[in-house]
Amino acid sequence: MIKAVYGDYQPLAAPGAIIQGPHYRFTILTSRLIRAEYSPTGTFYDGQTQTVLNRDFPVPHYEIREREDLLEIITDHVLIQYDKQAFSREGLVFKLRGYFSIYHSDWHYGDPIQDLGGTAQTLDHANGAVPLERGLMSRFGFSVLDDSQSLQLTQDGWYQVKQGNSQDFYYFGYGHDYRACLADFYRLTGPQPLLPKYALGNWWSRFYRYSEATYRQLIERFEAEGLPFTVAVIDMDWHVVSVPPQYGSGWTGYTWNEELFPDPAGFMAWLHQHGLRITLNVHPADGVRPFESMYQQMAQELGLDWEGGEYVVFDPTSPRFLEAYFKHLHHPKEEQGVDFWWIDWQQGQTVKGVDPLWVLNHYHYHDIQARGPQGITFSRYAGPGSHRYPVGFSGDSHMTWESLDFQPYFTATASNIGYGWWSHDIGGHIFGYRDNELALRWYQLGVFSPIMRLHSSSSEFLGKEPWRYPEPYASSMKDYLRLRHRLLPYLYTMNYRAAYQAQPLIEPLYYQHPEEEAAYEIANQYYFGSQIMVMPLTQPRHKGSLCSRFDGWLPEGTWYDIQTGLRYSGGRSLSIYRPLERMGLFAKAGAILPLSGEDGTDNSLANPSVLAIKVFTGADGHFDLVEEAETATDTLAGTAFLTTGLTFVDGKVFKLEPQGTGLRTYELTFVGACLTDLELAGQGRLVDVSHNDQGDSLVRLEADGPVTLSFKQAPRDSQQVRLDVIFSYIEQAQMENQAKDQIWALVKKDMPLAYKMLELQGLGLDREVIEPVIELLVTEP
């Protein structure tokens, strides 16, 4: 029997949390999370489901008021009124206590829920927006998760279709405390697993007829260009696709195409030697047919007439089939070198009540994890609870601006159902058109997405290799690939946060700013971990300004443009304008951003010997960097962690508190500040103190234990930085030369900012040409 058991979770609720009658049962999991069940037969299910694993919560305070025809349950946050009959709109109401709206805080059973959206199974063939399934977050303060039709998990590791027509749902009444809502959802359903570090780097993927030789040439070209990739995705042409016509299409296959890959084990060993993990694409729907190399063994094991050519039908309801499926189709290839599988299921349900996609995700993830903690799956979303099976494959989107424009919102909103590790076809997969700017903007979004996976279709004209684009696109693409790899220390820490602190990498703005209208109105802006806010560019640039615009919002406080170091005042809406090579990346004063101090040109996953730390001055800050211990291996013992505490007290000290990392070089950039009178105490030494072109202090030190850097701090002079950025913009803008001279003269003119802005607007030039200058003028000194 396949063993897919969640033994670490307790599906039985505490007896004190249960209120039960002949046909109903309420379980008060928290004061804001209530399970409600109605069973015509009076039987209730206490086991795990495909969505829910754990109901072992501390019993909250609640009160009961009861008479013959009415049950009232009162918690600190919710009032439930129930007539003790079959659930109905008139007989069951949940009332959220506290003001969220005049009348929308009451939910009558069966009423539609107005939530903020969740995610969707796929973006296959999407050219822009697609409808989203339900999420947990709502401006009205409540949502409902219906578990009535979920598969039931059995203690022997299998599943069963639920019998009967009982109702079983979970009411979430968390108001606008969205993070608490998500944390309790993870407690109920299980957390997002920790991803192996390799999954956070750059993935190369293409639906293309590679051979072993051409794939090696590609990887060697990446290495020569200094482009770091950590995952090699090999699409379906790894297996035989030209099959005898009596067997139908070659979409499903498990036999290596030895014309293209004569030595699969040697090829994959070579990829491993070059620092790449490997995934193969599989379409399981057609089962195993007689032309497959492993057909006879598998058919014999299943008792089929292999001599007569009886097909091995794909049957997700059969434990025997799945045992043989892994034993004969997958494990041998994993022994050859496959690290994980891309499960490309595109069909619907084959048996009533059973979604084969969920079955594949569930058992593939458990199977690969049983072979070591570095395994993952790569597959489409299969409903609530799918966050337990990362990574998500969003499908075959169109290569259009419309598709790009939808992806930031789609990715952030998926957090509303706990689904934090989407992988998109960066650059788009099919149809659409060639647009160099679109390709670069998609690269940029990919770097600040959960997973950075380039992909395209088989057309000879659709390759995403940077060298297939002209300058300046190619150089910028290369820079962003290297930046993604340099972000690994930060990304791994956020990966740890997602797994152990119930906060996904990407969060919509309203998670941190639930009472701000702008946080709901600006769909594409999001937080990328705890230290970065992203305004992605998803519209073509203006022909005159050569900049793309994003209409965004900065929360209260002081914010820095991470790429220029310019400082912005928050608490306002604004339009930002960025040339091709830059995007909207902001860090708040007090943010601490760790990066690899190496140049990002090789794909090493070792903890960097040089750590580059950007400290955004103007407020105190703290960041706990989490890294894998160098001794961590692919064993069932799991992963060991190293923590480095980074603390900044504005204007006074910076503290480094490494634990077990050994001697390391640290390159500190104090963005927005000039430091003097530096003194270092502790287990380290100052190596060098200098300044960058923006006037920020750069401090290089070595430490093998805790150190404290004391200093005096003064704000840098940002005026020249601002002028340099404005000059660069005006120089490249496509406009009349006389207009450039007029703009530059006004920029340098000594006059109040308000008058300067009025005069610029009075020049009669296109708004899209003038507004970038005004944006830069109003940055803080």
Task: Set out the residue ranges of the language-model regions.
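Catalytic-domain carbohydrate-binding cleft regions of carbohydrate-active enzymes
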Residues: I2-V5, Y9-Q10, I80, L92-R582, ...
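A low-complexity, Ser/Thr/Gly/Pro-enriched, surface-exposed linker/loop concept
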Residues: A4, L29-E68
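Short, well-ordered beta-strand segments enriched in hydrophobic/aromatic residues
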Residues: F26, I34-A36, I73-I80, M533-P536, ...
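Surface-exposed beta-strand/loop patches in extracellular or lumenal glycoproteins
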Residues: R35-E37, T41, H542-P555, Q659-T676
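Solvent-exposed beta-hairpin/edge-strand motifs
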Residues: V52, G552-T564, T669-R685
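A surface-exposed beta-strand-loop module
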Residues: L70-E72, V78-L79, D688-T708
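Hydrophobic or amphipathic alpha-helical targeting/insertion segments
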Residues: I74-L92
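Accessory, solvent-exposed terminal regions and/or long lumenal/extracellular loops of proteins
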Residues: A589-Q683, K712-P781
